């Protein structure tokens, strides 16, 4: 009898550990009067992918919900999702977009294009994950100079932090307040996504990554359309009525 009790206890422990392995590090963080949803991804255990179009039909996913349903149809549960970088009026990436090692849209080094909005607030940058599983946030110029092919990458802007310093174009008391999302690679395998639960300016959002989250290089992803999704918690960020189609979605699915 004791033998069977021990076996059941061990089995329960294994099941419990398996369940915990699927749980993401998600928390609500308060910073200077505003709340943020912050998700840490350990790339040693969580496979972060980037998705724009259905690989079968070529139709753009457009929304996190569409991607979630696609995952279900393939017996994969969506654990985490976030919009990728800035895109143009045709809902195509405005800058570099790399998916599964293929460069779909090349690096954009154009300067001073007013139609590009925040993307033209320089320097802009790239968030990339390389074939060795390591992630990095670099300015667009630094990414080009590296010349390394990424497994996945999105280009957006502006850079929030460059080598531990705030983007010099940010103004402390700016009245440009919006929902904002961003990403940093705190270490090569510790990726942090954050979205504000209310409108904030760039200066405050950059300081969140520097002073609260401990990042040295961080990239702004997008503004008032930005949301994060975490399985079991739902959506955080901009109100649903403000969300528009995305041209690229970061996602972590359950393992088959």
What are these language model-derived features?
Residues 92-166, 170:
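Active-site-adjacent helix-turn-beta-strand microarchitecture at beta-sheet edges
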Residues 78-80, 125-126, 134-136, 158-159, ...:
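Structural motif
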Residues 17-118:
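Zymogen propeptides
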Residues 5-16:
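Bacterial N-terminal signal peptides
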Residues 54-57, 141-145, 195-199:
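Short, solvent-exposed aromatic-acidic interface loops
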Residues 94-110, 169-217, 226-256:
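Conserved, well-ordered active-site substructure
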Residues 1-4, 122, 178, 245-247:
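Short, solvent-exposed loop/turn segments at the edges of secondary structure
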């Amino acid at each position: 009898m004791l033998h069977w009790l021990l076996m059941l206890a061990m089995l329960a422990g294994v099941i419990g550990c398996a369940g915990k392995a699927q749980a993401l590090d998600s928390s609500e963080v308060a910073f200077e009067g505003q709340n943020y949803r912050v998700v840490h991804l350990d790339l040693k255990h969580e496979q972060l992918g980037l998705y724009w179009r259905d690989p079968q039909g070529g139709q753009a996913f457009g929304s996190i919900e569409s991607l979630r349903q696609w995952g279900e149809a393939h017996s994969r549960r969506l654990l985490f999702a976030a919009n990728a970088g800035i895109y143009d009026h045709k809902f195509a990436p405005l800058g570099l977009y790399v998916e599964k090692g293929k460069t779909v849209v090349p690096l954009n080094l154009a300067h001073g294009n007013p139609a590009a909005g925040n993307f033209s607030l320089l320097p802009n940058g790239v968030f990339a994950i390389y074939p060795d599983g390591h992630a990095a946030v670099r300015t667009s110029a630094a990414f080009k100079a590296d010349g390394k092919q990424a497994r996945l990458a999105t280009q957006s802007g502006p850079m929030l932090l460059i080598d531990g310093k705030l983007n010099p174009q940010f103004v402390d008391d700016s009245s440009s307040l919006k929902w904002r999302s961003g990403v940093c690679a705190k270490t090569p395998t510790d990726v942090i996504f954050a979205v504000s639960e209310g409108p904030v300016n760039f200066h405050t959002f950059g300081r969140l990554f520097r002073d609260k989250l401990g990042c040295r290089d961080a990239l702004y992803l997008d503004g008032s359309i930005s949301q994060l999704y975490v399985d079991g918690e739902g959506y955080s960020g901009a109100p649903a009525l403000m969300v528009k189609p995305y041209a690229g979605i970061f996602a972590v699915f359950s393992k088959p």
